[in-house]
């Protein structure tokens, strides 16, 4: 058995907490203004009508209505139909 821990084993053993990213409200769901629709890093989804992007790229509803996922050119977009 080794009497020393080896190259880097004592320096390993850390991990960051999960960030709970992903789609929070799915297509067809009814949402209120201010509800978070998608939590993301970068713009995997882009904001469509009645949706804005927060500082951390989170998409949230500006108005109450029904969530719709679609395309805006080549981009995937999230909209809220009132």
Swiss-Prot record:
Protein name: Large ribosomal subunit protein bL27
Record keywords: Ribonucleoprotein, Ribosomal protein
Chain intervals for the UniProt region annotation (Disordered): 1-21
Gene Ontology biological-process annotations: translation
Gene this chain is encoded by: rpmA
Family stated for the protein in its record: Belongs to the bacterial ribosomal protein bL27 family.
A GO-annotated cellular component: cytosolic large ribosomal subunit
Species name: Tropheryma whipplei (strain Twist) (Whipple's bacillus)
Keyword Disulfide bond: no
InterPro entries in UniProt: Ribosomal_bL27 (IPR001684), Ribosomal_bL27_CS (IPR018261)
